[in-house]
Curated annotation (Swiss-Prot):
InterPro entries documented for this protein: Ribosomal_bL32, Ribosomal_bL32_bact, Ribosomal_zn-bd
Cellular compartments per GO CC: large ribosomal subunit
GO biological process: translation
Lineage, top ranks: Bacteria, Pseudomonadati, Bacteroidota, Bacteroidia, Bacteroidales
Gene behind the chain: rpmF
Protein name: Large ribosomal subunit protein bL32
Length: 65
């Protein structure tokens, strides 16, 4: 197994870790329903699955088929 030959200093360690940062998720507002959702994701609203403002699936019609 590999072992470090020298101790990694606090400064070097912290410089490396500066690139790991927490980011807020981007939230979009659906123009059709007015609901907030994540970008590039479908979302449920009143039993219907919406994507880009259009109905993809309706929960009530799935059981009738």
């Amino acid at each position: 197994m590999a072992h470090p030959k020298r101790k990694t200093g606090k400064s070097r360690r912290d410089k490396r870790r500066t690139h790991y940062k927490a980011t807020l998720p981007q939230i979009a507002l659906d123009p059709t329903t007015g609901e907030y959702h994540l970008y590039h994701r479908a979302h449920w609203y009143e039993g219907k699955l919406y994507y880009k403002g259009k109905v993809i699936t309706d929960k009530t019609s799935v059981g009738e088929v």
